[in-house]
Amino acid sequence: IFAEKQHTYALTGLFSIIAVILALLIQDWILVEVNWVRMGGFHLTLVISGFAMVVGLPCGIILALGRRSQLPVIKAFSVTFIEVFRSVPLITILFMATAMFPLFMPEGFELNKLVQVIAAVCLFTSCYMAEIVRSGLQAIPKGQFEAASSIGLGYWQSMGLVVMPQALKFMIPNIVSSFIGIFKDTTLVYIVGMFDILAMTRAMSNDVPWRGEFHEPFLMTAIIFFV
């Protein structure tokens, strides 16, 4: 019972953090409204990581269920999608999304670079979430599936009411670790010309008025990533 309460508190805390991040992004909190094209700094880091957390987990669950599907087409698509994106570094996916994807679009088609980056990070996150969810489902004894079926529950009812709640307690530590990794990986968007909090700190240190006073921004950035 104590262990179940701990997992419940951890899950509640995780979704509370995600809800707070989304609320800050939607309401702009105390930040001045900034155009998407000019967004940068810590706000950009929160936007990218927030979308990756919110979109990556549901998509990962769908991919994990697709990988366990008995339908060959769905299973083959899910396996191929997961393995391809997991085998490619995030830097490569970001470069392909921002530099190569527009080449295949019709002439005159323009897409916000931030949208491209968010989509790339969400796809990358969902593939890792899929493997975490799949490992959690495999930890559930087969008898739980049979018990749910014996009382007349369908596939989706069994997953939603019996299997997934039990599997979630096995997945929470890995999910949290993956979200932390994604938050740190947002620094890679500097490669495609976007200034996250770390890139903004570096740019600040090269600015003439900030010469010799760049220790504080780097220290604050280090504290944020450490926390």
Q: What residue spans do the PLM features occupy?
A:
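Transmembrane alpha-helices and adjacent helix-loop boundaries
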Residues: 1-227
